[in-house]
Amino acid sequence: MNKIYLILILFTFVGIILANVEKAEVSCTCDENCNDGNKCTLDKCNNGCCSNTPININDNDECTVDTCNPKTGISHTPVNCDDGNSCTADSCLCGKGCQHVPIACDDNNACTVDSCSNSTGCCHTPLSCDDNNPCTVDSCSNSTGCCHTPINVDDHNACTEDKCTQSGGVTHTPIACDDKNACTVDSCSNSTGCCHTPLSCDDNNACTVDSCSNSTGCVHTPINVDDHNACTEDKCTQSGGVTHTPIACDDKNACTADSCSNSTGCCHTPITCDDNNACTVDSCSNSTGCCHTPINVDDNNACTEDKCTQSGGVTHTPIACDDKNACTVDSCSNSTGCVHTPLACDDKNPCTVDSCSNSTGCCHTPINVDDNNACTEDKCTQSGGVTHTPINCDDNNKCTVDSCSNSTGCCHTPMSCDDNNPCTVDSCSNSTGCVHTPINVDDNNACTEDKCTQNGGVTHTPIACDDKNACTVDSCSNSTGCCHTPLKCDDNNACTVDSCSNSTGCVHTPINVDDNNACTEDKCTQSGGVTHTPISCDDKNPCTIDSCSNSTGCVHTPMSCDDRNPCTSDFCSWEKGCQHVALSCNDFNACTMDSCSNSTGCTHTPIACDDKNACTVDSCSNSTGCVHTPLTCDDNNPCTVDSCSNSTGCCHTPINVDDHNACTEDKCTQSGGVTHTPIACDDKNACTVDSCSNSTGCCHTPLSCDDNNACTVDSCSNSTGCVHTPINVDDNNACTEDKCTQNGGVTHTPIACDDKNACTVDSCSNSTGCCHTPLKCDDNNPCTVDSCSNSTGCVHTPMNVDDNNACTEDKCTQNGGVTHTPIRCDDLNSCTADSCSNSTGCVHTPINCDDNNKCTADSCSNSTGCCHTPISCDDNNPCTVDSCSNSTGCCHTPINVDDNNPCTEDKCTQSGGVTHTPIGCNDNNACTVDSCSNSTGCTHTPMKCDDNNPCTIDSCSNSTGCVHTPMNCDDGNFCTLDSCCSTGCTHTPIIIDDNNPCTVDSCCNSTGVVHTPVDCNDNNVLTCDYCSIKQGGKCIHVPMTQCKTFGKCGDDL
């Protein structure tokens, strides 16, 4: 079109030029003479010549086409800006020309998809809200758009999990309430859901500790009554107390030594009955103990001397009856032996033994009062009695056990002071007795706990110095012990308040510089001062009004360009400020009536397309108008019959799948088939028998728990099933045995309290049970010792009045006293010296032929008198020197094998040689150096285990020797570097500075070094906050618009 206008203009100018050429020669006197009849020229008369100049038709308006018609003159026709695009609003702006602004097609209906067609204009296509989810109801709201409302599957039963299936059905699956905890009873309440009731584990037994294991359930652990003493019987009482009753170890066997070991219990050690006498038969009687029965050497011939030899053989040596004594007539009778009729030599002196000497006649020898007991002083009294007064063996030495041996006299046995404690040095003081001095375990180190171990070793355990205070540095001084040095918390930062928390350690709290004015930048200076610098809020945007609020900071309020005219589009331009562009209301939609109201703005009133037919989908085409599309009722569900009603719309009638069997779940499958699945009737109740009836469905018949036992109470537990609890038959009478009979009755049979002990009176107490009262055996007889035998009862043993003197007649008097009346020993035989031996009684000693020479065998011959035959002293022992002393007799002196060296064991061999075997001094203790001194014997010198290393704990193990255990210097403080040096443990504070001024460095004793980033947040969302490492940790707050990258602030800005 513009080209046409240009051609017209060109033709017009050509015509004007041609006309002027034709009239170039016209002469004139005034302008009127020059009118060429063309309104497109300016006619002038200049110097008598006409000039017809084309006039300027340009109105400088780009929105007009300027033309000139010679007949009608100038015209300014508006430019046609229609670009043939229905999606633009075409207009012309002064200075800019045609403008093609895209139109807005938003119909403010969230249920349409808005678009624009260049040919037809705006299109509003109905939105499809089908989410292909059968478990939602799909709809559309004009204001919010598609709505997918989940279908309601809740059956209001907290014990089921309610779901919608892929086919759109609803399932209610019982939830599993098992919490896998055997200590709870799991159940489900329809209203509240799973219940986990704690299981009661009390077994009403005071002797068990009741607890519960999550995996196995109730645990009834018997309480530990063991006192680790095998000599006691350990029991728990009904009240929960503990008794430790000593056990009886008497095995009633006199042939064992009964004792008890705390570790192993009763010990019955067989006693040794060997008396080292080959002439006795050694045995033991379980009732009386050791028996030493002399072997029978008697050949029933009084005329032989019957003997048992040292080797156990028997000799019968004919006796010599010739006493070589003219004072006797010697003979021998096989029945009575030698007969020596003595002379009457009685001198009427009870203290002499009257005899007759073959050479001198009667001899009156003082009687032998020696009782062969070295422990008595023996005397003869004027009445002829013999006294044996015990001697005093006390040596006034507390380090000896004083006793007396009948054969050797007083014995002073060194006392054993070994207390079986390896931690004491045992010695003895003559005045006070045993002394047990604790060994010195002190290592003079206040940082160790010094102890002596059970095996005699010494341990030096480092003590713990942790005072649980994070504000102290804990260490230990070998001289003074634990040290708790206050922690230095000064961080040399004037902008923090330094303090210490006992639990966490140093705290460096930044001082508060906030003046509560968001319009200032608050800082703390290096000297500790505070500055509040006003911030700049200019955002260089002409479309905002910049200000600052003390509470929130910079405020950039958008400038309002609203001219209160809804028919203009108001906006603000960075270059020109507020702009008001006329609004085009043509939506080019055949489905709306378009208009604009100064009060309400553009209105696009939808036309009504409803044809009142529910079987059509009514819509409107932006290009053609109303459209009535038949409704598609196929729901793609093979389990429904689809149809449509003009009044109600689509109908989806479910096909009938019911097989009239209440025991099946009837369903239609996705392929359109029908399934009848048996339903599960398990009600998870162990007290019902679950079944199903085709007519009524699930049946839960109560379980019969009758066990046909009249002695139980039958019940049922929903979780475990039948419970058969024994009935209580206890009559609270400890004297009856309570039972339940087969018919359900209860019997209380008296218990038998007979303890088979004849020394107790047996009875029964209803509260405590059997009582066994000791039997009273006092017979009121002072001459009996009253006791009791468990098998026979009371025993009244006559009092032992025996004074062990066979020379007295011993009696008990009626008042309980004892008399010892000397007996008469006169046998009216003059050939014997009559006396009495305290041990054997009357002794009728043949007259003494002793020549006081122990080297002769003295005898008496009826015809010749005393005989003195030299004796043989050979003991057939090559290790003795045999000799004879007239005063003492045979002497068998052991040869001297002692080499005066205590380090050898000296022996004489069977061949008579001498050996000196070095002794072993090994005490099997690796902590001693064993050696032997020729002067003192074995020595066991304690080994020195000090390795002069302060970083080891030196001790000694009896089995392996010196042990150098590295000292544990760990003080449990993550803020110290623990090591050991020449002075012992050191705990050096670690370096926590990470050389980053943007972190607050600290150390927690329990966790170690913490580098906490400096908090630079000024709580202003319009600034980018960071800590600058380059500026020594200074907080920087940059306007967000100046940040280079989204979400990143730092030294790279």
From Swiss-Prot:
<comment type="function">
    <text>Component of the stalk tube, the matrix that encases stalk cells.</text>
</comment>
<feature type="repeat" description="X-4">
    <location>
        <begin position="565"/>
        <end position="588"/>
    </location>
</feature>
<protein>
    <recommendedName>
        <fullName>Prestalk protein</fullName>
    </recommendedName>
</protein>
<dbReference type="InterPro" id="IPR052846">
    <property type="entry name" value="ECM-enzyme_regulator"/>
</dbReference>
<feature type="region of interest" description="41 X 24 AA tandem repeats, Cys-rich">
    <location>
        <begin position="38"/>
        <end position="1019"/>
    </location>
</feature>
<feature type="repeat" description="A-13">
    <location>
        <begin position="541"/>
        <end position="564"/>
    </location>
</feature>
<feature type="repeat" description="B-2">
    <location>
        <begin position="229"/>
        <end position="252"/>
    </location>
</feature>
<feature type="repeat" description="A-25">
    <location>
        <begin position="949"/>
        <end position="971"/>
    </location>
</feature>
<keyword id="KW-0732">Signal</keyword>
<feature type="repeat" description="A-9">
    <location>
        <begin position="397"/>
        <end position="420"/>
    </location>
</feature>
<feature type="repeat" description="A-20">
    <location>
        <begin position="781"/>
        <end position="804"/>
    </location>
</feature>
<feature type="repeat" description="B-6">
    <location>
        <begin position="517"/>
        <end position="540"/>
    </location>
</feature>
<keyword id="KW-0964">Secreted</keyword>
<feature type="repeat" description="A-23">
    <location>
        <begin position="877"/>
        <end position="900"/>
    </location>
</feature>
<dbReference type="GO" id="GO:0005198">
    <property type="term" value="F:structural molecule activity"/>
</dbReference>
<dbReference type="GO" id="GO:0005576">
    <property type="term" value="C:extracellular region"/>
</dbReference>
<feature type="repeat" description="A-3">
    <location>
        <begin position="181"/>
        <end position="204"/>
    </location>
</feature>
<feature type="repeat" description="B-1">
    <location>
        <begin position="157"/>
        <end position="180"/>
    </location>
</feature>
<feature type="repeat" description="B-7">
    <location>
        <begin position="661"/>
        <end position="684"/>
    </location>
</feature>
<feature type="repeat" description="A-18">
    <location>
        <begin position="709"/>
        <end position="732"/>
    </location>
</feature>
<feature type="repeat" description="A-17">
    <location>
        <begin position="685"/>
        <end position="708"/>
    </location>
</feature>
<feature type="repeat" description="X-1">
    <location>
        <begin position="38"/>
        <end position="60"/>
    </location>
</feature>
<dbReference type="GO" id="GO:0031154">
    <property type="term" value="P:culmination involved in sorocarp development"/>
</dbReference>
<dbReference type="InterPro" id="IPR001673">
    <property type="entry name" value="S_mold_repeat"/>
</dbReference>
<feature type="repeat" description="A-10">
    <location>
        <begin position="421"/>
        <end position="444"/>
    </location>
</feature>
<feature type="repeat" description="B-8">
    <location>
        <begin position="733"/>
        <end position="756"/>
    </location>
</feature>
<feature type="repeat" description="B-10">
    <location>
        <begin position="901"/>
        <end position="924"/>
    </location>
</feature>
<feature type="signal peptide">
    <location>
        <begin position="1"/>
        <end position="18"/>
    </location>
</feature>
<feature type="repeat" description="B-5">
    <location>
        <begin position="445"/>
        <end position="468"/>
    </location>
</feature>
<feature type="repeat" description="A-8">
    <location>
        <begin position="349"/>
        <end position="372"/>
    </location>
</feature>
<feature type="repeat" description="B-9">
    <location>
        <begin position="805"/>
        <end position="828"/>
    </location>
</feature>
<feature type="repeat" description="A-16">
    <location>
        <begin position="637"/>
        <end position="660"/>
    </location>
</feature>
<feature type="repeat" description="X-2">
    <location>
        <begin position="61"/>
        <end position="84"/>
    </location>
</feature>
<feature type="repeat" description="A-14">
    <location>
        <begin position="589"/>
        <end position="612"/>
    </location>
</feature>
<feature type="repeat" description="A-26">
    <location>
        <begin position="972"/>
        <end position="995"/>
    </location>
</feature>
<dbReference type="Pfam" id="PF00526">
    <property type="entry name" value="Dicty_CTDC"/>
</dbReference>
<feature type="repeat" description="A-21">
    <location>
        <begin position="829"/>
        <end position="852"/>
    </location>
</feature>
<feature type="repeat" description="A-27">
    <location>
        <begin position="996"/>
        <end position="1019"/>
    </location>
</feature>
<feature type="repeat" description="A-2">
    <location>
        <begin position="133"/>
        <end position="156"/>
    </location>
</feature>
<feature type="repeat" description="A-15">
    <location>
        <begin position="613"/>
        <end position="636"/>
    </location>
</feature>
<feature type="repeat" description="B-4">
    <location>
        <begin position="373"/>
        <end position="396"/>
    </location>
</feature>
<dbReference type="GO" id="GO:0031012">
    <property type="term" value="C:extracellular matrix"/>
</dbReference>
